[in-house]
């Protein structure tokens, strides 16, 4: 049978064991529903409750609806008042039971009724201490409860069930000021808990929205709905209780998390669930009281100016994102409300100082406290101590971890004043016999019978007094305490004189002998202290100097450490300015909930040590960020044990703590404090004297307190009483000379002599032997003795023997269990005899222990059967006694409970004499069968003999050893007995390695969270967003540090281990910054150096091989404390981080506690270290989302040729036939080259997939589907189309291992259709490592000839990207941005033998012309093309490229970049799809191409080209066939002209249908009005034509290239947008107006078709730009005005470039202003032409601030004559000042007559700006082209093609019938070789076409040299 407690019902029963089952995991987290309660204010009549009383209570409460009022909480029990509202008269259950005679009612008057003023000292003191009674935390039951009647009094303050936060004086935290009433009353929140508050608020909102739990009257804690924002908050009702009649519908509530008070309706209240009480009230009340005072007499009345200044200070600092810090100086009750006296400051200003400077406050001279104020703590002060300063101090108390208290020498006068005031007050108060228990501040009598100031902490079983001026804690009786009157301001206002300190760079645990040495050398003598740092609780980290000796260094030497600072460097400024980083592991201390103050602020607020009349702010010489310890160092001293023994001042409202008592946490146990979340403290050191034992605050402890026993008050070891009495440090007074009494001086000189004899002497016998004669002048030194027993020391508290790995020594075997478990003694050690002498002296041990106080692991003095006493450790409790092991011998025995004694403290500093060992290479399991024989031989060889022992390895608290005697190696016994020769290891010449094999980093126990789990962690090491390390907030590296340090100190260099070490090997290494040992894994090896990763922190370090030590397997098995992370959803193969990403990320994640959610885990590198892909949040902020703005996406597209093999949709080629153009031009034949269907998906080199490092971005691979295109387009906002050469970089470097390039498989070669080409990127964009021997296969898909060629490392490459490189170039921004090299010819080739989807485009609603062919000039050719594939795709192939040849020539990859022609090929921009065939212009980037044909690098220039877009549904460019005919160049018998045409076809993108049903009215009106009204402005005069005619050169070969752009309609802004629109036209398309580029709003999706035609033997004199309007067969042959409503679907533009090989002159248009009006003439300035003998540069650019277009023409062009036709009625020559004006009227045909335009010889390019403004008629926008000259030395010009829509669309772009202007464009002006006049008579016939037109525009590029 077992007894079980039903947590959901509260009853306990005995049940059968077999009826008990394991509770499912999902039910374990649910809290118990039953609440343990106790009725308040009643007690039983007798010892216990009678059965009648219990029955009466059951009848009264069972199965009834009751109202419960929680009065307080004691342990796990709630003290409640039970009300039964069903009763008419008395509703209190306590009073009902009392009236019925079943209980005794005890009523306590509330505190509020005892706040009157009394004149005499007795009444005044009585009143003060009655005010100290805390109804929440009292040791008496009557003080734990309130009267129900008093609760009904509106003047009393009800108890709040919300748990408050508590802060000790001196603490400094970061806060948020949440509510300001006045400088005397405001509310703050702990900033470190802001994330928890946000979670709670979200939980409250969800609870109130999903649950309707009405408020029940009588409860004070509730949820209230704020009238300000409608949200629900945790609230506490302060007055106008719902139960009262007045204001029954309204209550005043305090929002406990914000401090705001508001009156709300009762209907806006809800009941609060118990789980919402878990988080403490976040707002705490603060005041500047007694730091500064207002000008008024009332210290709490502040004027509005002061309050307003306070508000401004907070608001301005919040806007500047300054950290608000708060330092706590004291705690007080102000009108019964707990308030903290604080100062709020930023790194630059303090509110106290500010208000004084502004004249709103004054420095306060303390006289007395206000009657309504009762101090709960003494004031804290830094005593004007500066960080980095130097002070003379006297140490008054030392604890086991070398934490000590000291007094400043300069405060001696203050200490004497306090002593005098104490004596005076005691004499007065003792006249009155007060029955009131003193409050937390009182006077206590020390064992020297003197009174001292103390802070009282009342526990359940004892009362502890912390003497605030000396630092020690003692137990006192109630009779030994006196209250402090309120007028004793000297005692209340003088700050505490004991300053808590600790030494810098000290370990967590210190051996007792070191502590003893420290005490003997520092107590009662003046020392100098350098202040290194200040912790958050006010403790100072110091370096101590005794004269010229640095005590820190001496201690480190005794500890066997290397001193990090040189001894004797007392005045070293660097040392003084170096802040001791106490949290080097990167985690803020978990011992408190507030941030480190000294390391985070620039000012240290100090309270004046004497008058407290102001604050002094000292600026430290060094300032570090709050978490600046992320300096990538794995310091395991994190945090050091400086926090273990801190004195805690807290006002405790929790009744379980019973009183306002600060507790000094002994270093020997962990203590749960209300104000702090502590780390687990280190184990007992056993170094504590009886005089300074400190009780634990744990309510479950078997001992709630431990008595001082007149041994050293501040000693670490018990000593002889005579020494203890005089060297102990009780509270005391200093004389002016700081001299010790003769007795103290003598005791100090005696030190620790005669310890053995004095130990057993009674302290009480000698308590008065050396009592000082003058108590006011001497330091008192005896404490009152107590009868309770302190906890015993543990085995781990003993110091360790100094044994190093590989050490050889003479030993004796003391005890043997097995060959793998025996104990030895070091022969040279003589301490064993000393121990025996101390334990077995004449007196013997007298301090017998009670068995119930002895626990496992305790060290005791045990009596053995031989009649002697030995040191032992308890290993087990048995029925017949205690099983103990004798630590100095190794054997065990059962000891009777009556034979155990306390171990003398003097023996706690001596290590255990026995050393546990095992024979190396010998295991018990391997010789179990022969164990008896083996043990016999082992005992024979080892018994009572001195042996030679070599310590090989320390593992699991046991040394593996090799024993040898005069017969040889004893380890060989294992071999002789087992008979297995394979187990015979040769005796190593150097220290042997254990049998453990070298484990890899993958064998570490990685403590990673589960997938999907969210944990709290700190970033311990940050490399980048894709690689950083985190430590869990629950990680405990302290205990691990001790083991790792111990293993490292015992290790030696092992040559065998160094030979076996490899990448992934775990090891133990010393970190160079702090000389501590840390676990690490080897990540890289090079020569004699290794790079290791500190696995518990994440940072790396490179060190010498000999510095690496073997890591024991047991330590390697301890879970790793950190784990690597990377931000989720950022793939480096798809993008990269910007340069600011690392800095921003580091600042974000190192600020504080992070919330990390693990999404994916993968192993990294050879070390197999698991890395977590995580989402990171800090203070509710999503770091992943924040980092998105620093991410630059790159398109990783699939191969369109490979995609075509698996295409699921088939599109007939008949649907994509190019009409009429093939019929017209019969100059070339269709290409016979098939599409390279075998192209690889991933670029490869010699068969190996070409991979890249983290910076590599394969940006240009095409998108295989519309879905992928839309997805990529949505996720990127960076330029992916690059526009710069790498020619110089490739030429200068023969090393191709870091070639910046982008692989693109969109561009087919002329001869190898569909062959991928390569485009250079900027050097900062891409770096791909590959071997030069693999280049051929890397680009095997570029051309079929490359399989038979080789590229050598010392040769240059031309690497280009296809014209269809990325989707993004499809938008109008690209068309306005991308500079195209016009010298490069482009041909349209057919992707035969495969089905190809649209390149980089999303599939439209229906396929359009999508075939590519080469040299298609007739219907037969088109038919041939149609038969080659079911789904054909257009690809743009740059011509005359060294890699992707436009000519039908063999590919020559080995090219001299300085001499080869046509080095640069332009990328014709493609329009990318965005969802439904539309493109976001912002996501478009530009390509920059350059063709270097026969030119040197210095002669290469960029020719800007801006492909234009369809600006509206039916706004199309019309060109007549006659214009095309005029543009045919005259035949030149010496030239060979080749025409290549490029067709770009754009699909419809959610545009109105062909019939324009969406705009019927516009069609009717506009078509009728503007039909046949298109005139063709000529931009050149006849004089221009004559001058521009190129000279005939029979040796030249002219090559015409034509570019056809077919643009489809896209979703454009509505016609309401009528603002000015800026367009870019470089070059202008024929017809006067190009497609208009839209930068922001317009987005077009293009498909591309290519037609190549060769025109040979053309006369260059007759060359003209050719315009071909091709929507159908008949449409392409007619000319004249055409209504645009018949050309709804697409516009096809074709450019034809004539090229020649001979040098020629170029007339370049320098300035051009072109204005288009719907009802006005278009004026065109003349185009000056520049003549150059070396290169023909024709650039027309549009320049706007955002982006720029580059155009570069490198070849020479010979232009003989170019004419600009003008109307006959033009009589005025507009050529003035080199300007050519041309006006176009859409209603009338106007001819333009302009003279020849000349340009300066050095002009290389021109910039034009197009401006569209609305005309009076509103039919069109005025389009102005304004030239802006660029800098002469620029390599290219920049232009912008942007359409910015604001209020509405231009009507001309919306209406499908708005005619476009026809006429020559800037390209024709600058390149045409012959005259032409556009004719529009026949264009009327085009109305009947099917809505598609193609406009072919050609220009004459420069011939090759």
UniProtKB/Swiss-Prot annotation:
Listed GO CC annotations: P granule
Tissue localization of expression: Expressed in testis.
Bias type Acidic residues, positions: 1491-1500, 1522-1535, 1876-1887
Coiled-coil residues: none
Signal peptide residue numbers: none
Disruption phenotype: Loss-of-function in embryos causes arrest of karyokinesis progression.
Domain Tudor intervals: 1-30, 215-279, 435-491, 853-910, 1060-1118
Keyword tRNA-binding: no
Biased composition range(s): Polar residues: 592-602, 651-660, 687-704, 746-766, 774-787, 1663-1673
InterPro entries: SNase_OB-fold_sf, Tudor, Tudor_domain_containing
Region Disordered, residue ranges: 564-795, 1213-1245, 1449-1599, 1655-1682, 1827-1905
Keywords for this protein: Cytoplasm, Differentiation, Oogenesis, Repeat, Spermatogenesis
Subunit relationships: Interacts with FRGY2 (a component of messenger ribonucleoprotein (mRNP) particle) during germ cell development.
Domain notes: The tudor domains recognize and bind to proteins with dimethylated arginine residues.
Annotated function: Tudor domain-containing protein involved in germ cell development, more specifically the formation of chromatoid body (during spermiogenesis), Balbiani body (during oogenesis), germ plasm (upon fertilization), and for proper miRNA expression and spliceosome maturation. Component of cytoplasmic mRNP particle through interaction with FRGY2, and binds to maternal mRNA related to cell cycle (RCC1, RHAMM, INCENP-A, MAD2L1, HELLS) and a germ plasm specific mRNA (Dead end/Dnd1), it is proposed a role in translational activation of the maternal mRNAs repressed in mRNP particle.
Protein name, entry field: Tudor domain-containing 6-like
Organism: Xenopus laevis
